[in-house]
């Protein structure tokens, strides 16, 4: 099993409701990192993809098919969107993996979106339970929160 922890610092513009992810720290139990640079790169790439799911990517389905399957209408993060990333490799050799290693291909996707949702909730005082947390979603949540 994989274990990880993720922390995110965000800034929310109260005029445009845009979320800027300032920093993301991801600590991952990797077993034994046979090639730490590649392991770190895998984790950072997956983390950036997961952050995109949190605030940018909105896959729309229509009649069972993806309706926005083009790069022009399904926004994904680029290098310019990358916040400061810190990756902590927690090395505890895994007795059942090759040379003590664990797979790290999927675990970077698990924590960042929840960490972003929690950070935005901490900043604004209203909870989010669906992704992406777009400016429109933030504006609607703020309106509901202000009315309550």
What label would you give each PLM region?
Residues 1-148:
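C-terminal catalytic domains of large/alpha subunits in multi-subunit enzymes
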């Amino acid at each position: 099993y994989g274990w990880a922890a993720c922390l995110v610092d965000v800034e929310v513009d109260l005029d445009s409701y845009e979320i800027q992810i300032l920093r993301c720290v991801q600590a991952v139990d990797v077993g034994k990192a046979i090639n730490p640079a590649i392991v770190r790169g895998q984790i950072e790439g997956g983390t950036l993809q997961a952050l995109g799911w949190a605030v940018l990517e909105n896959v729309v389905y229509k009649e069972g098919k993806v309706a926005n399957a083009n790069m022009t209408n399904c926004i994904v993060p680029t290098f310019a969107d990358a916040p400061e990333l810190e990756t902590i490799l927690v090395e505890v050799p895994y007795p059942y993996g090759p040379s003590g290693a664990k797979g790290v291909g999927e675990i970077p996707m698990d924590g960042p979106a929840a960490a972003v949702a929690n950070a935005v909730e901490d900043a604004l005082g209203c909870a989010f339970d669906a992704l992406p947390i777009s400016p429109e979603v933030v504006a609607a949540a703020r309106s509901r929160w202000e009315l309550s």
